[in-house]
UniProtKB/Swiss-Prot annotation:
Disordered: region residues: 34-103
Protein name: Early nodulin-12
Cellular component terms per the entry's GO annotation: extracellular region
Tree of life domain: Eukaryota
Induction, as annotated: By soluble compounds from rhizobium (in cells through which the infection thread is migrating and also in cells that do not yet contain an infection thread).
GO biological process: nodulation
Gene name for this UniProt entry: ENOD12
Record's compositionally biased regions (Basic and acidic residues): 45-103
Entry keyword set: Cell wall, Nodulation, Repeat, Secreted, Signal
UniProt Sequence repeat ranges: 34-38, 39-43, 44-48, 49-53, 54-58, 59-63, 64-68, 69-73, 74-78, 79-83, 84-88
Signal peptide location: 1-24
Length: 103
């Protein structure tokens, strides 16, 4: 029985030496730390409804019509243009009385 307890003792001792973190070390969750800043609060955006305004129009401004100042120019005489007398085509003439069939 002494050899059995001695072998178990050697086994546990070698396990403590060979395993770097040891048996007592197990995973611990990180300690709770309160946040340094407050999280942003999601507030609904408060937008006022648009106000229906008529479009801004400038009032009409009365402007007198623009008149050019009179310019004193001597009257210009048109040069006479020679036009040949107008000749009527023979189709527009009245037929002679003897060829007229209308009474």
């Amino acid at each position: 029985m002494a050899s059995f307890s001695l072998s178990i003792l050697v086994f546990f001792f070698s396990a403590l030496v060979l395993v770097p973190q040891g048996f007592a070390e197990y995973y611990l969750y990180p300690a709770y730390r309160p946040p340094q800043t407050k999280p942003p609060v999601n507030k609904p955006s408060h937008k006022e409804p648009p106000v229906n305004k008529p479009p801004h129009k400038e009032p009409p401004v009365h402007k007198p019509p623009h008149k050019d100042p009179p310019v004193n120019k001597p009257p210009q005489k048109e040069s006479p243009v020679h036009k040949p007398p107008r000749k009527e085509s023979p189709t527009h003439r009245h037929p002679p009385a003897e060829d007229n069939i209308h009474f």
